[in-house]
Amino acid sequence: MGSLSGLRLAAGSCFRLCERDVFSSLRLTRSSDLKRINGFCTKPQESPRAPSRTYNRVPLHKPTEWQKKILVWSGRFKKEDEIPETVSLEMLDTAKNKMRVKISYLMIALTVVGCICMVIEGKKAAQRHESLTSLNLEKKARLREEAAMKAKTE
């Protein structure tokens, strides 16, 4: 009984070694054919095909009026008349990105100007002794007076 289990273990380890060697020598190629590395199994010979189309050119795009304005505003061209009939998509993307950056700089500048204006207005209000606390107290006093007047008339 003991020799049978030993034989089974030896056979299993031998099988695993062979399996590992077989699968390590096989690999998957692009056309999903199995190919043996050491050359015993080879891929079927295929006749070389001439490429049907070559894509050496950059795809061109006819810009719309809005895209032409973006190209001019981004500084790529001086006038709309200078823009060719077709431009590359990469050129349009670059112009759009430049415009995004310019617009974000403008928004940053407007935010800073707005903050400065609010600080100046706040200082002027402080000189007039206007604060949220004083305004709320005045409003509550006025509402109490109106409520008292309303209670007297009823």
Curated annotation (Swiss-Prot):
Quaternary structure and interacting proteins, as annotated = Interacts with HSP90AB1; HSP90AB1 is essential for FAM162A mitochondrial localization and pro-apoptotic activity. Interacts with VDAC2; the interaction is probably involved in inducing mitochondrial permeability transition.
- State the membrane topology: Single-pass membrane protein
Q: Which residues form the signal peptide?
A: none
Main function: Proposed to be involved in regulation of apoptosis; the exact mechanism may differ between cell types/tissues. May be involved in hypoxia-induced cell death of transformed cells implicating cytochrome C release and caspase activation (such as CASP9) and inducing mitochondrial permeability transition. May be involved in hypoxia-induced cell death of neuronal cells probably by promoting release of AIFM1 from mitochondria to cytoplasm and its translocation to the nucleus; however, the involvement of caspases has been reported conflictingly.
Q: Please state the protein's primary subcellular location.
A: mitochondrion
Q: Does the keyword Chloroplast apply?
A: no
Among InterPro entries, the record links this protein to: DUF1075
Matching Pfam families, A to Z?
DUF1075 (PF06388)
The text of the family note is: Belongs to the UPF0389 family.
Question: Which GO biological process annotations does it have?
Answer: cellular response to hypoxia; neuron apoptotic process; positive regulation of apoptotic process; positive regulation of release of cytochrome c from mitochondria
Q: Subcellular location, in the record's words? A: Mitochondrion membrane
Task: Name it.
Answer: Protein FAM162A
One GO cellular component term, please give it. Answer: cytosol
Required for proapoptotic activity: region residues: 76-102
